[in-house]
Amino acid sequence: MAVQHMRIVLSAYLTNGQVNDAAEYLRGLGVSTGPYSVAPQPSPKAAVNLEIGNIEAAEFAEHGNEQWNHFEAAVGQCLSRFGEWLATVPTQNMDRLREAGWKVWSIANLWIDQDQMDFHLPPVLSAQLGRLELELYVLSNE
């Protein structure tokens, strides 16, 4: 597998240039953040990032030759749980956030060690991104 590290967030910012209030954004989502937490904002106008997952392949080195299978399974579980959590967000809440000027999307940052990356979305995540009309940006170091 070429992916060494994956970080995924649900990101949001106000398009009108106002201060991005994390508490206001979370109230707008209208659901418990569950296992997720808000990453520190470097400045008040920086995007609000709800940390969904941050997984390193090196965490699974103790599995020897099975390291990549365990890493891939952990990434898949993380993405599936994210989809299941998104299923709890009512579409009208996301619509209201947009009407209030919030731009909401998801970002997957991948660190890869070669010129290919093996990355796929579980159906539950694809379905929920579509239902909520959320874009997914996949960024990498290559």
Residue ranges and their predicted role:
Residues 1-140:
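Acidic (Asp/Glu-rich) sequence patches and key acidic residues
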